[in-house]
């Protein structure tokens, strides 16, 4: 029986390019727009409380039982470190052990090399992650406490992910159509992750309950099993990045029935564009 360790890796090293491009067209206050133009979207003040998404996500993680957080940020980041430093000592989040990992950008690139590379660099900087289990997720999605808890629960499979019911996601249909679909076997093990499948093939992806399941980039992984796959992940020919889903595809091709899919019916608030800011109370 696998008993996952309470480690959470949050990927927040991106440059928030889609958010910044959308600022002109969004109906948000000048204060929020100014913040969004300067800092990572996970640090934008949200709702009446002005509590940013990263604080909300870490609160959910803490309530779910996580005690250590590895926050992957851009190589020259100061904003996340300043946010953490300025949190009052009385804030419950200060009970977390938080470590910063920095994703360096290669000299010949303007942007980081992708999510698989982010994890690889974090595991180099914190070698304990190469020998332990951890949950990894995006820094711009507000994952529910139950999803985070599910990935901490004892299980038989070494790795796991949350398989979201596509019908539960309250996004525009065109946006949902862009999400990767999961292929699962009858026992609920991951067989594949397919990006932007053709409309006429959708019926082939329904699970035993007749549901279409999508990945929202939240996984529970064994570091010793996945480290080499992150290191050796090929660069996607279109996006020109090393992507976590591709590393996972390569892994399950060689090690089938090692990633358990846990179904979930829930909406997942996120901050892809400036229009999403108003969805947070």
For the regions a protein language model found, what residue spans apply to each?
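Conserved alpha/beta core of the MobA/IspD/sugar-nucleotide pyrophosphorylase nucleotidyltransferase superfamily
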Residues: 2-4, 193-281
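Conserved core of the sugar-phosphate nucleotidyltransferase
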Residues: 144-228
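Conserved beta-loop-beta/alpha segment of the NTase-like Rossmann-fold superfamily
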Residues: 95-181
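Short, flexible loop segments at boundaries between secondary-structure elements
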Residues: 45-46, 167-172, 247, 254
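Aromatic- and Gly/Pro-rich amphipathic surface segment
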Residues: 33-41
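A structural signal for short hydrophobic beta-strand segments in well-ordered beta-sheet cores
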Residues: 43, 181-184, 261
């Amino acid at each position: 029986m696998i008993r996952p360790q309470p480690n959470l890796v949050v990927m927040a090293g991106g440059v928030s390019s889609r958010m910044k491009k959308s600022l002109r067209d969004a109906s948000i206050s000048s204060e929020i727009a100014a913040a969004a133009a300067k800092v990572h979207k996970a640090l934008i003040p949200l709702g009446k409380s002005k509590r940013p998404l990263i604080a909300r996500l870490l609160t959910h993680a803490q309530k779910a039982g996580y005690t250590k957080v590895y926050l992957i940020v851009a190589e020259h980041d100061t904003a996340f470190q300043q946010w953490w430093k300025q949190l009052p000592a009385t804030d419950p989040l200060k009970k977390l052990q938080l470590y910063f990992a920095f994703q360096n950008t290669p000299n010949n690139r303007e942007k980081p090399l992708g999510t698989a590379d982010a994890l690889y660099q974090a595991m180099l900087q914190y070698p304990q992650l190469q020998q332990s289990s951890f949950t990894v997720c995006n820094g711009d999605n507000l994952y529910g406490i139950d999803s985070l808890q599910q990935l901490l629960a004892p299980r038989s499979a070494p790795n796991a992910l949350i398989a979201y019911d596509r019908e539960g996601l309250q996004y525009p249909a065109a946006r949902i159509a862009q999400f990767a679909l999961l292929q699962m076997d009858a026992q609920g093990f991951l067989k594949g992750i397919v990006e932007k499948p053709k409309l006429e093939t959708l019926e082939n992806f329904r699970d035993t309950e007749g549901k279409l399941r999508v990945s929202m980039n939240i996984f529970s992984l064994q570091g010793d099993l996945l480290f080499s796959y992150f290191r050796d992940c090929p660069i996607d020919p279109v996006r020109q990045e090393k992507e976590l889903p591709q590393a996972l595809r390569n892994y399950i091709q060689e090690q089938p029935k090692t990633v358990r899919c846990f179904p979930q019916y829930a909406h997942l608030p996120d901050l892809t564009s400036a229009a999403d800011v108003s969805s947070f109370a």
